[in-house]
């Protein structure tokens, strides 16, 4: 198993993810600069949090044109696993690999806190270590984490069992309390909470470990 972490100018959670995957789980992990186009040899790709290109225009709007993301589309089509965390989730929606959009938080402020979450679907390969309706708590840190979509898209997400996580106490105004979604095939997961910040036993917080430990099987 080999993991690639895509790094953009402005990414700042790439090393956190590497510590979680390689330091805590022992999975070989490499950084992939946004200009690369070669994803051969990787079993899963993570797009980490941060402020790609300074979040100018809107979150992920510039990053979605990076050369590596053209290769990512082919990677997904072939069944490759992709996880987008926070800014990574925003990029996946801009790229069209996930539906909907992430907009300014309802209170118009940056939120740095913990969020109680409910597991709504285990369809995604990333979620298979949970059971439906499990309760977990993960850190959140975002200014534009309010998930929005049309009524048609919402119905499709629900019909396809693609709502992966919901907030127990919605912190940002996301429609239907949505904190994370998956694509129809289940190999792409986008989520605003940060599982990589809840993987280290030394911190006494490992609720996110079950997501990343799917890389071990």
From Swiss-Prot:
InterPro entries: Class_I_gatase-like, PRibForGlyAmidine_synth_PurQ. It catalyses: N(2)-formyl-N(1)-(5-phospho-beta-D-ribosyl)glycinamide + L-glutamine + ATP + H2O = 2-formamido-N(1)-(5-O-phospho-beta-D-ribosyl)acetamidine + L-glutamate + ADP + phosphate + H(+); L-glutamine + H2O = L-glutamate + NH4(+). Keywords: ATP-binding, Cytoplasm, Glutamine amidotransferase, Hydrolase, Ligase, Nucleotide-binding, Purine biosynthesis. Pathway: Purine metabolism; IMP biosynthesis via de novo pathway; 5-amino-1-(5-phospho-D-ribosyl)imidazole from N(2)-formyl-N(1)-(5-phospho-D-ribosyl)glycinamide: step 1/2. Part of the FGAM synthase complex composed of 1 PurL, 1 PurQ and 2 PurS subunits. Its main location: cytoplasm. GO terms for cellular component: cytoplasm. One of its GO terms (molecular function) is glutaminase activity. This is Phosphoribosylformylglycinamidine synthase subunit PurQ. The lineage of its organism: Bacteria, Bacillati, Cyanobacteriota, Cyanophyceae, Synechococcales. The active site is at residues 86, 194, 196. Its EC number is 6.3.5.3, 3.5.1.2. Part of the phosphoribosylformylglycinamidine synthase complex involved in the purines biosynthetic pathway. Catalyzes the ATP-dependent conversion of formylglycinamide ribonucleotide (FGAR) and glutamine to yield formylglycinamidine ribonucleotide (FGAM) and glutamate. The FGAM synthase complex is composed of three subunits. PurQ produces an ammonia molecule by converting glutamine to glutamate. PurL transfers the ammonia molecule to FGAR to form FGAM in an ATP-dependent manner. It is found in: Cytoplasm. CDD domains: GATase1_FGAR_AT. It comes from the Bacteria. GO terms for biological process: 'de novo' IMP biosynthetic process. Residues 2-217 form the Glutamine amidotransferase type-1 domain. It comes from Prochlorococcus marinus (strain NATL2A). It holds the Pfam family GATase_5.
């Amino acid at each position: 198993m080999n993991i690639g972490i895509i790094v953009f100018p402005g990414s700042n959670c790439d090393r956190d993810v590497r510590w979680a995957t390689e330091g805590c789980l022992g999975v070989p992990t490499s950084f992939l600069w946004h200009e690369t186009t070669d994803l051969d040899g990787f079993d899963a790709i993570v797009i980490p949090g941060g402020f790609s290109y300074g979040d100018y225009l809107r979150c992920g709007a510039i990053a979605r044109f990076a050369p590596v993301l053209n290769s990512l589309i082919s990677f997904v089509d072939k069944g490759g696993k992709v996880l987008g965390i926070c800014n990574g989730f925003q990029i996946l929606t801009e790229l069209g690999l996930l539906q909907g959009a992430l907009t300014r938080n309802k209170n118009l402020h940056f939120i740095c806190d913990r969020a109680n979450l409910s597991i709504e679907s285990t369809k995604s390969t990333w979620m298979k270590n949970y059971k439906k309706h499990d309760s977990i708590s993960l850190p959140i840190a975002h200014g534009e984490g309010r998930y929005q979509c049309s009524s048609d898209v919402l119905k499709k997400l629900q019909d396809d069992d693609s709502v992966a996580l919901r907030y127990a106490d919605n912190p940002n105004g996301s429609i239907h309390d949505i904190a994370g979604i998956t694509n129809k095939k289940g190999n792409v997961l986008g989520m605003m909470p940060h599982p990589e910040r809840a993987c280290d036993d030394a911190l006494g917080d490992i609720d996110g470990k079950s997501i990343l430990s799917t890389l071990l099987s």
